[in-house]
Amino acid sequence: MNDDSQDKIIHDIRIQLRKAATELSRWKLYGSSKWAAEALAGLAEAIDVDQTHSLADESPLRNKQGVPKQMFEIPQNGFGLSETEYDLYLLGSTLFDAKEFDRCVFFLKDVTNPYLKFLKLYSKFLSWDKKSQESMENILTTGKFTDEMYRANKDGDGSGNEDINQSGHQRANLKMVSNEHESQSNISSILKEINTFLESYEIKIDDDEADLGLALLYYLRGVILKQEKNISKAMSSFLKSLSCYSFNWSCWLELMDCLQKVDDALLLNNYLYQNFQFKFSENLGSQRTIEFNIMIKFFKLKVFEELNGQLEDYFEDLEFLLQVFPNFTFLKAYNATISYNNLDYVTAESRFDDIVKQDPYRLNDLETYSNILYVMQKNSKLAYLAQFVSQIDRFRPETCCIIANYYSARQEHEKSIMYFRRALTLDKKTTNAWTLMGHEFVELSNSHAAIECYRRAVDICPRDFKAWFGLGQAYALLDMHLYSLYYFQKACTLKPWDRRIWQVLGECYSKTGNKVEAIKCYKRSIKASQTVDQNTSIYYRLAQLYEELEDLQECKKFMMKCVDVEELLEGIVTDETVKARLWLAIFEIKAGNYQLAYDYAMGVSSGTSQEIEEARMLARECRRHM
């Protein structure tokens, strides 16, 4: 076979392999696509074909009718990839799809195109993340590292057999692989490489030429900076990325994770509407303007959901998005979650029912649906949901959380904890799983384990109200009320209009001896109450505190409010109203108001036998003086 014939065959094979790698990946046959890309990378070089010319310099003859129809052209994607770079992209992309991240990094080690550089460094980051997650799986299972694991990490062999003979050449090879592996696992080296590349690349281009490749690198830099707790620089990188390319929803979510309190969100919102600008290269038409860019509107809604803002500030954006996206399941799930956060469980359940009918195989947000069914004690419906999602995908974090809620509803807390651990093994950032697992440990009276779970939750998401609230409750169970007070205060900054948090803050202040602050908290709780029946116990507690402060007139006022609530609720009696009637009867007897005292005593128709007997005794005493 002469050289011309061989080159022609190689050229045809190259075209066919490119076509196979691209089309098989498009139709999700990742194994076959990876094989074709590997074969393409291992193909011999064609002598008469210049493989380094740019796509912009493609010969117009490619579009002539004489070219066979089966000829596969490299897509004119505007990424500026040469033929060699495109072949590398196919190989790296298929290896990435097959989750062979280290191999992807190896084959892309010398790339200079920003898109390929992102693919390489993103693979490197995911490889590091995968290894760190695998090390955490052991903690979730056993709670500690064993000596065998330490030896395996140290010596590379967990079997304990230290008599394996290796040649010097083998040791050298192992050392080389180990050093390269260690370098790939070092997150700081990834950040350094990104910074070096961005510094050199930004010099070469004008500000308006920033493209998607640059946006992706800024995004990855932000993710790594956030991982290293450098929040301010991470936010700066995310904003640069969004300025170049605004439709990266993951970048918006990462930016939101940088917000720890409501004030941060307000400052960011002001910055977005006053100083932020979109670049023209990747943002089209109306989406270049802050006013009409839908991603900013989605971001504002997500921030409202996470930081429990006032609905009036976001209602206009929500109405606009619902008009533009009337069938977007994400928005419907958002609406349902808002109802859940506002404790409107009936509306939330109805909205989730509609979502399940519209998109029955969507598992996102269904763990919130299971929380609603759990709180409403609809155990049969929760059991059906758990069975349904397990048939769709048993190995999704959402599925594990739903099954865990089902076992918790059946009081099988050990099984519930097991499924929450599975959810965390599948996705270690599932904050909800950490928080709910903490609740399960509280049910088992294991406060120390609960505290550890809640701490993990707030480490991942400092905006998690339930985790801060859970920490306060766990320390309250241990009678460590100053610690409890601190964590309840943190929770209060996230939900200042929640009645429950002011009530527990009042209890904490009361137990630490600060009665004045306790009274203030209880009064704030009353203002935040939505219905009258929620206030009975608070009125009685306020009356007790005023009695301890020897302010009997204020005490009497709140005792009377307790009784008034009973009348407003059409005679529904609580323990507090019974005690309030007895206290008022004694108070009026001391004041000489026997008729009024008699009425209070006769109003005690239920309660403990001791309370009923005391009421009869007071009534008899009143009759003797009347």
UniProtKB/Swiss-Prot annotation:
Q: In UniProt terms, what is the effect of altering T94M?
A: In CDC23-4; G2/M cell cycle arrest at 36 degrees Celsius
Q: What is the effect of changing A39T?
A: In CDC23-50; G2/M cell cycle arrest at 37 degrees Celsius
Show the GO cellular component annotation of the record.
anaphase-promoting complex; kinetochore
Q: Which domain of life is it from?
A: Eukaryota
Query: Could you state one GO biological process linked to this protein?
Result: positive regulation of mitotic metaphase/anaphase transition
Q: What is the effect of changing G472D?
A: In CDC23-1; G2/M cell cycle arrest at 36 degrees Celsius
Name the cystine pairs: none
Q: Is Phosphoprotein among the key words of this record?
A: yes
Instruction: Tell me the residues on which Phosphoserine occurs.
Output: S59
Q: Which InterPro entries does the protein's record reference?
A: APC8 (IPR007192), TPR-like_helical_dom_sf (IPR011990), TPR_rpt (IPR019734)
The impact of changing P326L is: In CDC23-49; G2/M cell cycle arrest at 37 degrees Celsius
Q: Which SUPFAM superfamilies match?
A: TPR-like
According to the record, mutating R103Q results in: In CDC23-40; G2/M cell cycle arrest at 37 degrees Celsius
Its post-translational modification remark reads:
Phosphorylated by CDC28, which is required for the early mitotic activity of the APC/C in its CDC20-bound form.
**One of the record's GO molecular function terms:** cyclin binding
List keywords of the entry alphabetically: Cell cycle, Cell division, Centromere, Chromosome, Kinetochore, Mitosis, Nucleus, Phosphoprotein, Repeat, TPR repeat, Ubl conjugation pathway
Residue ranges of TPR repeats: 215-248, 295-328, 329-362, 363-396, 397-430, 431-464, 465-498, 499-532, 536-569
Q: In which pathway does it act?
A: Protein modification; protein ubiquitination
Q: Where in the cell is it found?
A: Nucleus; Chromosome, Centromere, Kinetochore
Q: Does the keyword Cell division apply?
A: yes
State the similarity comment: Belongs to the APC8/CDC23 family.
Question: What further note is attached to this protein's record?
Answer: Present with 80 molecules/cell in log phase SD medium.
Q: What functional role does this protein have?
A: Component of the anaphase promoting complex/cyclosome (APC/C), a cell cycle-regulated E3 ubiquitin-protein ligase complex that controls progression through mitosis and the G1 phase of the cell cycle. The APC/C is thought to confer substrate specificity and, in the presence of ubiquitin-conjugating E2 enzymes, it catalyzes the formation of protein-ubiquitin conjugates that are subsequently degraded by the 26S proteasome.
Q: How does it assemble?
A: The APC/C is composed of at least 13 subunits that stay tightly associated throughout the cell cycle: APC1, APC2, APC4, APC5, APC9, APC11, CDC16, CDC23, CDC26, CDC27, DOC1, MND2 and SWM1. CDC23 interacts directly with SWM1 and binds the destruction box (D-box) of the substrate cyclin CLB2.
Q: What is this protein called?
A: Anaphase-promoting complex subunit CDC23
Q: Which organism is it from?
A: Saccharomyces cerevisiae (strain ATCC 204508 / S288c) (Baker's yeast)
